[in-house]
């Protein structure tokens, strides 16, 4: 056989006898097999042949094999023929060295040397001898058979002529987990997410907390040298959290070009600097009204604005127009400048400026700032004067909420509204302005909530700021520590600060005025809001609410510093500081607290069985406090100081009601003193009603009480009996009297009023349209609507027709004749009434309460109030009417009403409600005007 035909193969030759017959059986399937797949053949000596492309083999071994060496042939070699091998069957399976039973599953007997695997010499990580195969090859793993573990090729791969590959990986083999094990791992994953979300500042607290073990580790998988305690949260997730914190912010979403809240607020604040400029008066009027504001309004009730800063910014034109409009609106009532004054009443002069300022403020409730808050407080005071109870109540509530939103109830050193995280330290003047604005909200809450069923919103313990400093310290910017409302000192002075050591000396009129109003708020809460009924102790007991309030009122006046105690010298000192009105107002409030507490004991004599000694002492304190208030008002008038605070007018009203009681006293000296003090108080109330509209109602109430007391004196009543019948009028009750200002709606004839469904009643129950028979006969029958135009058309001709038809019989079927007779009677009664009282009504400007009433129903013709806007010109006669009480006034003969009853003291005066005769006691040439 020619070997040139098999250049690509090297066979192990055994010298077969018939080579030609086997030439056609050469296995060509391994013709292109790489020699590297059979590494065991590389050590053998191959036959040198020039035709081998893979390299030249040594000739020695080749020749040796060709010569028929006795060495056993390699049956794995390509040169061997399995079909001619006697130890193989027709399927190529080896059958050499088989013994009985092997084909039935037995194991061949091998030597001990051959049974030792190749990997037995390897050691484990612990240094022990390895007993198990560390890693099986990929083909054996796929076929799921036992791998011998030899490298680079195992025994199975060599027999099967397939590549033997071992997968080398660094991942540890972990046991398979079932579904329950996966559920156990979820809490651990959730815990890791929570830890990643913890801020950096909270890591110190979380670092000491060990993480819980969700599932115990498999025994043997955790080395014994590893500690069992888990790592802390900071150690495990600290780098990740720090990297997350330092990561740049996410880019803005495309299309989201809307402005942020901060940008909107800054835009509104910039707009506030120019909005309302077109409504401002001239520069001269602005400066004039600013001086009027600081002379008549500042310090009386509210200590708002810093005068040097305000005037400097006003001249420079850097003030927001809304603030200038607000100041001009509230100050216009006190000026006599002809450019500001109008034909209407004084308390309505600044309404045009106030309307512009009110519109600007109410649109900015979303963006609170100190400017809007100050405007709300001043506008609330202005609406108080214009009898707009609803507006004043709403503006006060909005101001209180805004003050808490700005954190004015806290004494902060830095501005809480710092932009971009910057902290701006507040100066002393800025901190004092913030304190005074908050205290103004506190005072407004006490004033507005003093009426019945109006609880107070601000608790005293929520305000953690000191009281205002003296006025001169505030004007000149001199820091000084003061006490809080409860007497604590938040910042006690040190010897090295250079401040005044006595904290009470740093407190001026404003601080003690706030304490007086706070005490008055507690007293009114106890008397008018049900706290008095909850007191189980009698009034004269030392633990009762009454005695606690009485002691607080007396001790507050006694605790004043020497510079604030009332004296002529201290009044002159305050004149030099331009604060005499504030000084007088503070002492009026202190006396009013004593009057209020003591008068409550007088009213409760019969109800609680008060002892005579206790009642006598309470009566003495009440009359002394009332006299003291009148003396302060008289001294203010003599010294040229006008106390313009509205609450001072209410104190004068309370004092007046006590003087009216003293008129029927059997003590001549008390009676004379009461008459003189009553004159002083009524003159002061007449002056106040020009600037604050609600005092028209109080003046009429005083007139009613005076008439009722004179009627009671004729009936033989004494002071004690009259005091128990007296119901006390609260300061905040004017809200119910004037909820929406002065309008004709509150004087409308109820018989002609047609019920309409309003939008405010949309959620309430539907009212029946029909009336029962009982209501049909008891309620007055309303007039027909079609008669209204006829009555209005005939009104201008009434007087002329009355003159023509005097003495003529009335023709039947003419409704005008009945109206003429009614009008004639009303006019005659009007002249009798005005002549008897001596009211100076002249010309067209005179007030005509009966002619101005509704002519549709004469039964309601006497209910018109002199404060109707249709008759505002009637207010002018009060300035020219002399106000005095002559001695003959006590001898006037006032009749009772038709039923013989005496009206209560707190009712409004109703014209025509008393029978009077001008010839008996009212026609002696004396003039009486309240």
Curated annotation (Swiss-Prot):
- Transmembrane parts of this sequence: none
What keywords would UniProt list here?
A: DNA-binding, Metal-binding, Nucleus, Transcription, Transcription regulation, Virulence, Zinc
Would the keyword Zinc be found if you checked this record's keyword annotation? yes
Q: Does the keyword Secreted apply?
A: no
Family matches, as PROSITE patterns: ZN2_CY6_FUNGAL_1, ZN2_CY6_FUNGAL_2
Q: Name one GO biological process term.
A: DNA-templated transcription
Where in the chain is the DNA-binding region found? 137-164
Q: Name one Pfam family in it.
A: Fungal_trans
Note the coiled coil stretches, chain numbering: none
| Superkingdom, natural source | Eukaryota
Q: Which GO terms describe its cellular component?
A: nucleus
Instruction: List where in the cell it is found.
Output: Nucleus
Q: Name one GO molecular function term.
A: zinc ion binding
Q: For this UniProt entry, what is the primary localization, expressed as one broad class?
A: nucleus
Tell me, in a sentence or two, what this protein's role is: Zn(2)-C6 fungal-type transcription factor that has a role in the establishment of the fungus within the plant and/or the progress of the disease. Regulates the expression of virulence factors such as SIX1 and SIX6.
- The identity of this protein, by name, is Zn(2)-C6 fungal-type transcription factor FTF1c
Q: What gene, per UniProt, encodes this protein?
A: FTF1c
């Amino acid at each position: 056989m020619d070997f040139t035909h098999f250049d690509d193969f090297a066979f192990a030759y055994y010298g077969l006898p018939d080579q030609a017959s086997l030439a056609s059986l050469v296995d060509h399937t391994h013709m292109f097999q790489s020699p590297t797949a059979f590494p065991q053949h590389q050590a053998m000596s191959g036959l040198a042949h020039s035709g081998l492309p893979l390299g030249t083999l040594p000739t020695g071994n080749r020749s040796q094999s060709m010569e028929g060496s006795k060495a056993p042939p390699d049956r794995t070699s390509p040169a061997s023929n399995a079909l001619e091998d006697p130890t193989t069957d027709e399927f190529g399976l080896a059958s050499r060295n088989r013994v009985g039973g092997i084909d039935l599953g037995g194991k061949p007997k091998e030597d001990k040397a051959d049974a030792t695997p190749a990997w037995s010499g390897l050691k484990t990580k612990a240094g022990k001898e390895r007993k198990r195969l560390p890693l099986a090859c990929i083909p054996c793993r796929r076929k799921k058979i036992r791998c011998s573990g030899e490298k680079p090729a195992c025994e199975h791969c060599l027999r099967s002529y397939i590549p033997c590959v071992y997968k080398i990986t660094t991942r540890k083999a972990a046991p398979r987990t079932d579904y329950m094990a996966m559920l156990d791992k979820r809490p651990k994953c959730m815990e890791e997410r929570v830890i990643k979300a913890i801020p950096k500042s909270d890591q110190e607290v979380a670092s000491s907390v060990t993480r819980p073990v969700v599932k115990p580790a498999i025994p043997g998988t955790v080395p014994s040298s590893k500690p069992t305690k888990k790592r802390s949260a900071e150690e495990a997730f600290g780098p990740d959290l720090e990297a997350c914190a330092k990561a740049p912010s996410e880019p803005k979403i495309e299309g989201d070009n809307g402005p942020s809240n901060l940008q909107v607020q800054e835009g509104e604040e910039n707009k506030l600097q120019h909005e309302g400029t077109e409504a401002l008066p001239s520069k001269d009027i602005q400066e004039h009204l600013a001086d009027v504001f600081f002379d008549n309004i500042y310090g009386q009730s509210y200590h708002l604005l810093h005068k040097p800063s305000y005037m400097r910014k006003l001249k420079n034109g850097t003030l927001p127009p809304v603030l200038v409009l607000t100041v001009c609106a509230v100050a216009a009532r006190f000026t006599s400048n002809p450019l500001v004054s109008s034909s209407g009443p004084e308390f309505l002069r600044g309404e045009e400026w106030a309307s512009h300022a009110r519109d600007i403020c109410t649109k900015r409730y979303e963006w609170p700032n100190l400017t809007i808050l100050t405007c709300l407080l001043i506008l609330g005071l202005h609406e108080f004067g214009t009898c707009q109870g609803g507006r004043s109540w709403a503006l006060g509530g909005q101001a209180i909420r805004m003050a808490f939103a700005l954190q004015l109830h806290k004494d902060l050193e830095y501005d809480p509204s710092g932009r971009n995280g910057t902290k701006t330290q507040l100066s002393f003047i800025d901190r004092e302005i913030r304190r005074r604005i908050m205290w103004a909200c506190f005072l407004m809450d006490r004033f507005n909530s003093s009426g019945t069923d109006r609880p107070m919103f601000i608790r005293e313990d929520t305000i953690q700021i000191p009281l205002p400093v003296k006025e001169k310290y505030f004007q000149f910017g001199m820091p000084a520590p003061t006490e809080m409302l409860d007497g604590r000192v938040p910042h006690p002075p040190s010897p090295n600060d250079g401040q005044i050591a006595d904290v009470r000396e740093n407190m001026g009129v404003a601080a003690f005025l706030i304490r007086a109003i706070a005490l008055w708020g507690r007293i009114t809460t106890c008397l008018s809001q049900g706290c008095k009924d909850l007191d189980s102790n009698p009034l004269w007991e030392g633990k009762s609410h009454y005695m606690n309030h009485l002691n607080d009122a007396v001790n507050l006046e006694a605790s004043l510093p020497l510079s604030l105690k009332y004296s002529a010298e201290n009044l002159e000192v305050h004149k030099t500081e331009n604060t005499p009105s504030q000084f007088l107002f503070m002492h009026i409030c202190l006396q009013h607290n004593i009057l209020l507490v003591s008068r409550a004991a007088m009213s409760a004599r019969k109800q609680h069985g008060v002892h005579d000694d206790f009642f006598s002492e309470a009566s003495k304190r009440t009359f002394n406090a009332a006299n003291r208030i009148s003396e302060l008002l008289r001294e203010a008038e003599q010294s040229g100081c006008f106390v313009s605070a509205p609450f001072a007018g209410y104190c004068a009203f309370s004092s007046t009601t006590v003087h009216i009681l003293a008129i029927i006293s059997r003590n001549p000296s008390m009676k004379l003193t009461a008459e003189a003090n009553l004159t002083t108080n009524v003159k002061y109330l007449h002056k106040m009603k020009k600037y604050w509209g609600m005092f028209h109602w109080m003046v009429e109430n005083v007139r009613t009480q005076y008439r009722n007391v004179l009627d009671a004196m004729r009936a033989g009543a004494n002071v004690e009996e009259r005091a128990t019948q007296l119901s006390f009028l609260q300061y905040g009750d004017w809200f119910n009297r004037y909820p929406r200002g002065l309008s004709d709606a509150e004087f409308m004839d109820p018989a002609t009023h047609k019920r309409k469904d309003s939008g405010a009643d949309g959620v309430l129950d539907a009212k029946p349209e029909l009336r029962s028979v009982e209501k049909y006969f008891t309620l007055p029958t309303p007039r027909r609507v079609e008669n209204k135009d006829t009555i209005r058309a005939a009104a201008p001709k009434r007087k002329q027709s009355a003159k023509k038809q005097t003495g003529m019989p009335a023709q039947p079927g003419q409704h005008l004749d009945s109206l003429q007779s009614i009008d004639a009677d009303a006019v005659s009664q009007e002249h009798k009434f005005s002549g008897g009282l001596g009211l100076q009504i002249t010309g067209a400007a005179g007030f005509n309460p009966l002619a101005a009433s509704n002519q549709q129903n004469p039964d309601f013709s006497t209910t018109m109030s002199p404060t109707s806007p249709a008759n505002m010109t009637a207010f002018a006669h009060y300035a020219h009417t002399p106000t005095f009480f002559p001695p003959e006034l006590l001898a006037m003969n006032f009749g009772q009403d038709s039923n013989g009853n005496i009206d209560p003291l707190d009712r409004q005066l109703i014209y025509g409600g008393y029978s009077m005769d001008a010839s008996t006691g009212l026609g002696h040439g004396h003039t009486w005007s309240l």
